Regions:
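Juxtamembrane/interfacial segments around transmembrane helices
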Residues: 76-82, 119-131, 164-180
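Cysteine-centered iron-sulfur cluster-binding motifs in ferredoxin-type domains/subunits
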Residues: 21-40, 68-87
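Generic N-terminal helix/loop capping motif
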Residues: 30, 36, 40-43, 53-57, ...
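Ferredoxin-type iron-sulfur electron-transfer modules in oxidoreductases and energy-metabolism complexes
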Residues: 4-18, 42-70, 87-152
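Generic detector of bulky aromatic hydrophobic side chains
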Residues: 25, 53-56, 80, 219
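C-terminal, charged low-complexity interaction regions
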Residues: 149-230
Length: 230
């Protein structure tokens, strides 16, 4: 259990985020956000509660909500679209999650641990979603026409063999230059630092992979320079 001073520091970090004042503007207590929230239908989670806790600056209850409740949010932002006061409970939850990671809260580690393998795959290989990865049966809300599109996909690809229309065979191919640029972005924005706080072992594996990719890129650049000189 954190001390009151630690809880206060956590709240100060939440409130100090540049997005905080934009996402929190008061509360009419109308309940529209919770009534339209998909997560509220299945979990002990209420967007209105998040707004009210932050608005009243109840640091102890805010800390308690960060143990489990904030991880139930689906980040669909329906709440932000519906709120008459222009609040963004989903945006506030995003801030709270980032602060939870920054403070190495156990709740963040518990939630993110199962995604270690996915994180490794995304960072080391790519993160594209190709059309033939999609299973229409899992998304009935897309309507019946999606079945027609999916059924003709392979035929359409033969008729229009555009390389940029990715499929599973090529969707995970990422150029060396793009990979190195992404690694730099993740470093500069603190993504890799957050990963290190959550799972040091996974971070070590990914860091070694990144170093190898950067060495490969440097070798490639040298080869290009030699070819240009010739």
């Amino acid at each position: 259990m954190a001390t009151y001073a630690e809880m206060q520091q956590i709240f100060d970090d939440i409130r100090g985020d540049f997005r905080y004042d934009h996402d929190l503007n008061g509360c009419l207590n109308c309940g529209i956000c919770t009534a339209t929230c998909p997560s509220a239908q299945f979990y002990d989670y209420s967007p209105r509660e998040i707004v009210q806790l932050l608005w009243t600056e109840n640091v102890e209850q805010i800390y308690d909500a960060m143990q489990e409740k904030i991880w139930a949010c689906a980040q669909c932002m329906t709440c932000a679209a519906r709120c008459p006061f222009k609040n963004s409970p989903g945006g506030l939850v995003a801030i709270m999650r980032e602060v939870a990671i920054k403070h190495e809260m156990q709740s963040a580690k518990d939630v993110l641990r199962p995604f270690g393998r996915v994180m490794l795959k995304l960072i080391t290989t790519g993160n594209q979603l190709s059309p033939d990865m999609i299973q229409p049966d899992h998304f009935p809300d897309w309507g019946p026409n999606i079945q027609k599109v999916e059924g003709d996909l392979q035929v359409l690809r033969k008729a229009i063999p555009v390389k940029t229309l990715q499929t599973v065979e090529t969707a995970w191919e990422v150029s060396l230059k793009t990979s190195v640029e992404m690694y730099t972005i993740w470093e500069m924005t603190g993504v890799l630092k957050s990963l290190e706080l959550m799972d040091e072992n996974l971070f070590d594996v990914i860091e070694d992979f990144i170093d190898e990719k950067r060495e490969d890129y440097e070798d490639w650049l040298e080869e290009q320079e030699e070819e240009d000189d010739e």
